[in-house]
Amino acid sequence: MEIILGVVMFTLIVLVLSGLILAARSKLVNAGDVVIEINNEADKQIRTPAGDKLLNTLSSNGIFVSSACGGGGSCGQCRVTVKEGGGDILPTELSHITKRDAKAGCRLACQVAVKQNMKIELPEEIFGVKKWECEVISNDNKATFIKELKLRIPEGEVVPFRAGGYIQIECPPHKVAYADFDVPDEYRSDWDKFNLFRYVSEVKEPTLRAYSMANYPEEKGIIMLNVRIATPPPKVPDAPPGIMSSYIWSLKPGDKVTISGPFGEFFAKETDAEMVFIGGGAGMAPMRSHIFDQLKRLHSTRKISFWYGARSLREMFYDEEFEQLARDNPNFTFHVALSDPLPEDNWTGHTGFIHNVLYENYLRDHPAPEDCEFYMCGPPVMNAAVIKMLKDLGVEDENILLDDFGG
């Protein structure tokens, strides 16, 4: 009798616990459809299955929120305002969102789980973002580790971007061998030196990454990007190579690529202040877009200078275009500094790091550097050095504009 009673009690306990688990699950995960109200506008309302992240849910419904890191929670770009239904803010969001913004409902769409009916607010410009399937026109080396990817927009379509803007590229699952990359002979010695052709990029999940445009709005029908290959750091040689850069470097003319955009916030101020552009590496992209836009589309009369740092002449590109701009526009000057010129360069120009060259040859004797606008994009070390120099010169934050994508 005691055995039977024990079995009955055990069964009852299991049933009660199962019921509690199911009840809790029903509270935590909505298995049916939920409704997401956007900007209190009925025509923007979304009905969708619960369970995915808000970023993916919006994308699946044709609303593309910027996410430079592809939804990993590291870039902080996918900010939205959640009025109801988002739950508590997560620790992964707190490094990107201030307490004041969090109190106002600011969240990262890639971290918010869609579990229940929600009310959110999105900037109106997001609804102008579209997706296109483009064709690769060319994908040529411009420097040892930088390719210029040129894409053709579908006929009849326009990407309405502003200079300094960016697009997102979709990276499909792939297996890419670096040995199959098309690297011209003039650049192969460094690739062999660092044994880079041994790497293989294998990706099983699709992802997104953001890249700034190198073309300016008047160069219609194309998207032009500068993409640096992201190899493992020397101290961690067995780490996987960059997902997106490996994919982009493998592309060949005729291949199809899906992009979305335009996005952006690294835009030129509409003032008469002097503009000083500072770039390095693949940070060339937004510099070219901005400077070409100012001089060729807007015909700006503002005083403009461009200071670009490279290792050697082999790493220089677009320099002939900028030299021509300088000849055609007396208000524009172009300056190059090589940090490690090769003997065959026969270089007689500036040498050293670009922030030092800019200071020693221009800003040190500038009557009012605090009145200039500084636009920069380059490797993180360069950006940090330039910002420190500008702060020491008394330049306010509002006049220091940084694009974090191009380094």
From Swiss-Prot:
Entry-linked Pfam families: FAD_binding_6, Fer2, NAD_binding_1
Residue sites binding [2Fe-2S] cluster per the record: 69, 75, 78, 110
Domain 2Fe-2S ferredoxin-type as annotated: residue spans: 32-126
Residue span(s) of domain FAD-binding FR-type: 129-269
Membrane topology: Single-pass membrane protein
SUPFAM superfamilies for the chain: 2Fe-2S ferredoxin-like (SSF54292), Ferredoxin reductase-like, C-terminal NADP-linked domain (SSF52343), Riboflavin synthase domain-like (SSF63380)
Cofactor binding: number and manner: Binds 1 [2Fe-2S] cluster.
Keyword tags: 2Fe-2S, Cell inner membrane, Cell membrane, FAD, Flavoprotein, Ion transport, Iron, Iron-sulfur, Membrane, Metal-binding, NAD, Sodium, Sodium transport, Translocase, Transmembrane, Transmembrane helix, Transport, Ubiquinone
Predominant location category: membrane
Cellular localisation: Cell inner membrane
GO cellular component terms, semicolon-separated: plasma membrane
Presence of keyword Disulfide bond: no
PROSITE patterns from the UniProt entry: 2FE2S_FER_2, FAD_FR
EC number in record: 7.2.1.1
GO MF entries: 2 iron, 2 sulfur cluster binding; electron transfer activity; metal ion binding; oxidoreductase activity, acting on NAD(P)H, quinone or similar compound as acceptor
Segments traversing the membrane: 3-23
Keyword Thylakoid: no
Catalysed reactions, as listed in the record: a ubiquinone + n Na(+)(in) + NADH + H(+) = a ubiquinol + n Na(+)(out) + NAD(+)
Required cofactor names: [2Fe-2S] cluster; FAD
Quaternary context: Composed of six subunits; NqrA, NqrB, NqrC, NqrD, NqrE and NqrF.
Function in brief: NQR complex catalyzes the reduction of ubiquinone-1 to ubiquinol by two successive reactions, coupled with the transport of Na(+) ions from the cytoplasm to the periplasm. The first step is catalyzed by NqrF, which accepts electrons from NADH and reduces ubiquinone-1 to ubisemiquinone by a one-electron transfer pathway.
Name of this protein: Na(+)-translocating NADH-quinone reductase subunit F
Native source organism of the sequence: Klebsiella pneumoniae subsp. pneumoniae (strain ATCC 700721 / MGH 78578)
